[in-house]
Amino acid sequence: MAFPEKLKALRLENGLTQDELGEKLYLSRASISSYEIGRNEPTIETIIAISDLFKISIDELLK
């Protein structure tokens, strides 16, 4: 599963809206949306924050 699909799946599994995930990561809903559709890629800092939030390794997140 590619990163955009993985991010959306993790968000939905945890019962979060794009707005709620954005708040937890200090990002806008538009940023979350753009990651989920593959328009933009997050910074390494954001990848680390997502990994920490969902308690999964960066390797799991990106593979």
Where are these regions (language model features)?
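Conserved hydrophobic/aromatic packing and binding residues within compact polymer-binding modules
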Residues: L7, L21-G22, I32-Y35, L61
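DNA major-groove recognition helix of helix-turn-helix/homeodomain DNA-binding modules
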Residues: E45-E60
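Recognition helix of helix-turn-helix/homeodomain-like DNA-binding domains
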Residues: Y26-E41
